[in-house]
Amino acid sequence: MDYDRYKLFVGGIAKETSEEALKQYFSRYGAVLEAVVAKEKVTGKPRGFGFVRFANDCDVVKALRDTHFILGKPVDVRKAIRKHELYQQPFSMQFLERKVQQMNGGLREMSSNGVTSRTKKIFVGGLSSNTTEEEFKSYFERFGRTTDVVVMHDGVTNRPRGFGFVTYDSEDSVEVVMQSNFHELSDKRVEVKRAIPKEGIQSNNGNAVNIPPSYSSFQATPYVPEQNGYGMVLQFPPPVFGYHHNVQAVQYPYGYQFTAQVANVSWNNPIMQPTGFYCAPPHPTPPPTNNLGYIQYMNGFDLSGTNISGYNPLAWPVTGDAAGALIHQFVDLKLDVHSQAHQRMNGGNMGIPLQNGTYI
């Protein structure tokens, strides 16, 4: 419907942001027909995101091109996709091609910078302590044939560490899993990231970057080409864990994070064995507010105070051939992630944030 084509998801907004403020801000791009701030059904508290609807495509395109700050706070603006469209069965080729192209301007545009993050391995964080390896394997096998599945445990106490890894026999299976970076497993919402081999992370231009002396234990790596407007990420050196944790994060409402300048070890694991992989989110991070910080990713885990760190971002782009393979995978796959947890998270009908910031 045209109604949905002109609708944008706005994430990470301040709790003081009113619908009128949201409408007034986006009116600079054209006529705003509707502005909604999502709120909890019971408490009425803002959930940290909202929606705006324009009158035409031109206004939508103009809004998507810019970096946005509302009430002095950086926000994430993406295309909105309705929930019933994502879960409609069966998938048609036309539907999938249209949705793939809608993802933040389409895969062709996203892959134009030449950066890819194809991998056969995924990182799964936020696992319940009751999740068994068999349950873990059974869930992720629905997306493709697996060659290795492991739930990480502490080497001393044998207690679960709250994360694991899944390796598929095909990179295309990973692309199918990453169509949603939130899944429900053992009645708990978990987050999925691409696990990129260490040798797969390198500087785009090889240039050295100066960072303050206090960060001498970090390694600064350019993220994406300058035209995308993103900054750099700070990485722990490989000897620390074997994969990169980010710096301490301060949570925005509804799971947004902004990186602070303090080292952090999370997943409740003081000591972690090397895994040899980095964890990469499925889409570029929004623009930085200073040279060292940026809004990292939508972690979306429980906000009970448990430390949940981000990971060094790699761009999500998929090549044209991979996009075709992904579509064919989708035709045969019946996603089963439309769950009560999603409904609780989204007030019944608000939808869930997807990779690339799209919203369903």
From Swiss-Prot:
Key words, A-Z: Coiled coil, Repeat, RNA-binding
Gene3D superfamilies assigned to the protein according to its UniProt record, in alphabetical order: 3.30.70.330
One MF annotation (Gene Ontology) recorded for this entry: mRNA binding
Residues in RRM domain copies: 6-82, 120-197
InterPro entries: Nucleotide-bd_a/b_plait_sf (IPR012677), RBD_domain_sf (IPR035979), RRM_dom (IPR000504)
Tissues expressing the protein: Highly expressed in inflorescences and roots. Detected in leaves and seedlings, but not in stems. Expressed in vegetative shoot apex and root meristem, but not in root cap. Detected in flower buds, junction of pedicels, joints of immature siliques and pistil.
The keyword RNA-binding belongs to this UniProt entry's keyword annotation: yes
Coiled coil stretches, renumbered: 93-113
Keyword Transit peptide: no
Its job: RNA binding protein. Can also bind in vitro to single-stranded DNA.
Protein name (record): RNA-binding protein 1
Source organism of this protein record: Arabidopsis thaliana (Mouse-ear cress)
Gene that specifies this protein: RBP1
